[in-house]
């Protein structure tokens, strides 16, 4: 039986992906802030899940929880970093920016480094990170969120390069969703908001194919390309 750990599995993409992996025969370790939701997930398919609650904004506690899960699973073949947060911040209030920085940068880095280290010890595996199309450019509505996702995209590329240089058989898959119908989708008039199940289908496809980068769903590929290559003089007027 294959073993996976999903970081940030209490809701949204992380939870739906954990459920899908369990349905496909994985034994899945899940972690997140809200223990009651993790317990509910574990009870939904007895024997398929183990869980450890931890707040990723406390990197030491989060990594200790991941270590417990890996021990209970007897190792891991796949690790998915899905924890993330972000708020619209029209007033540029630092109190709204700090959770995104502590979650998407500080805690995320600790968790991803932990996973990379375990795969390095094991001699391989598969690391998947959920970034965002939002990380392709800065965003005036939520500056810290966009910046943190750009950080994740570049960090994942760095790990991919590191693995290749050392000869470690470790695909690092960067999943870049557009707008998804989860608690994270904030703001009025968002276009092409995708249902979670379709996003998960795209993620599973990318995992199977061991893709380096996957924009999900496919309809977001052209918008992502346009966002990335749009002249700055045009892009700055869009926020």
Model-derived segments and spans:
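Short alpha-helical oligomerization interface
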Residues: 89-102
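C-terminal helical subdomain
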Residues: 174, 186-225
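Conserved glycine-rich cofactor-binding loop
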Residues: 10-11
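Rossmann-fold cofactor-recognition segment
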Residues: 45-60
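Conserved NAD(P)H cofactor-binding loop of Rossmann-fold oxidoreductase domains
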Residues: 80-88
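Active-site helix of classical SDR
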Residues: 112, 148
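Residue(s) in the substrate-gating loop at a strand-loop-helix junction
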Residues: 132
């Amino acid at each position: 039986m294959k073993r996976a750990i999903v970081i940030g599995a209490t809701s949204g993409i992380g939870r739906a992906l954990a459920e899908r992996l369990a349905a496909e025969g994985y034994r899945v370790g899940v972690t997140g802030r809200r223990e009651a939701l993790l317990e509910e997930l574990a009870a939904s398919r007895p024997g398929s899940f183990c869980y450890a609650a931890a707040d990723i904004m406390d990197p030491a506690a989060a990594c200790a929880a991941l270590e417990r899960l890996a021990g209970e699973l007897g190792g891991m073949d796949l690790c998915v970093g899905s924890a993330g947060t972000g708020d619209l911040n029209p007033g540029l209030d630092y109190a709204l920016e700090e959770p995104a920085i502590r979650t998407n940068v500080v805690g995320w880095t600790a968790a991803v480094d932990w996973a990379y280290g375990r795969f390095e010890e094991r001699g391989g595996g598969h690391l998947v990170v959920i970034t965002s199309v939002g990380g392709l450019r800065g965003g005036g509505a939520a500056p810290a969120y966009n910046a943190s996702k750009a950080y994740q995209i570049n960090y994942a590329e760095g790990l991919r390069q590191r693995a290749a240089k050392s000869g470690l058989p470790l695909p690092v898959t960067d999943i870049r969703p557009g707008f998804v119908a989860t608690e994270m989708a904030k703001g009025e008039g968002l276009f092409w908001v995708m249902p979670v199940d379709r996003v998960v289908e795209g993620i599973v496809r990318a995992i199977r194919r061991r893709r380096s980068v996957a924009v999900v769903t496919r309809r977001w590929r052209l918008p992502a390309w346009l966002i990335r290559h749009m002249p700055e003089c045009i892009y700055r007027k869009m926020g």
